[in-house]
Amino acid sequence: MTENRHILGYFNIIKNEPQYTPAYHLIKQSQKKKYPHFLILDEMNLSHVERYFADFLSAIESNENIPLYGKDELEIPDNLSIIGTVNIDETTYMFSPKVLDRANTIEFKICSAKDYMTQKLNKDTPNGDVEYLEDILNNQELRKMSIHELEKIFDEEFWDKFSDEILKFQNILKEAGFGFGFRVINEITRFMAAAYKYENKPEKWNENWKRYFDAQIKQKMLPKLHGSQKVIGETLDKLLESCKDYPTSEAKIIEMKNVLNKQRYVSFIN
C-alpha cells in the first residue's frame, strides 16, 4: 500500500462510481453499531505508513472526518480501534515520530521453546476490575478529558509524584532530541486513569501504580529512540539509572545498550 485508496477506496471515473474496500465497509458499519469494532492492518509497515495512513492520523488528532471523493466524508467513530502488526527486517519500513506519538507500541517477546512445548508459560491472572477492561467502550469520556480534568481523578500526593516522574523522563529524552509534548503526556495520563479505575480506585495508590507507568515508559516514551553511541549513549545511561523502579523498561534499555556496544548503532525496534 502506498496511498489511502487501498484502505478507503477511490472514485472510478470509468464506471463513474465509488470503489469501496472491506476496511471502508467495516468503518461504516461501526458507525451504526455501538459495540466495539477492530480494524486490523497486518504487516502494516511493508510500505511507508505515513503515505497511506496520513488521513487517519489527522482525523484521530483533530476529531474531524476524513474527506473522500467529491463531497463525501468518513467519520472515525469512538468504538473503532485500529491495530497494526509490525515486523522489522530489511523488507520493512520504520515508523516516523508522528506515527509513534499517536500509538502505543507493544512489543511481543519470543518465548522459551522449552516453556512453550511443556506448557509452562507464565500466565498473569488479572486481579482488578476485569469487566471494565473487557468493554473498551467503558468510560469513553476519559478520551476527551483535558489534563486539568484528569488531575481531579487522583489525589494530590500521587499527582505530584506522577508529574515529577514524567518531567524526569521528558528532560532526559529532550537532551538527545527525543522529547515529547502535550499529546504524549495526555495519553499517558489517560492510560494511568484507566489503570486506576481497573484497580478499583484505591484510596492510596502507592507502589502498584509503577507497573502501569513502566508500561507507558516503554510504549510511549522509548520507541522513538535511535542513534549512534555519540547520539544516545549517555541518554541510555541516564534512562537506565532512572528505570530502577521500572523493570520492563529497564530490561529494554539494557538490551539496547548491549546492541549499541556491539553494533555502534541501535533503535528501539532492533
Label every model-predicted segment.
Residues M1-D135:
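AAA+ P-loop NTPase catalytic core and its hallmark functional loops
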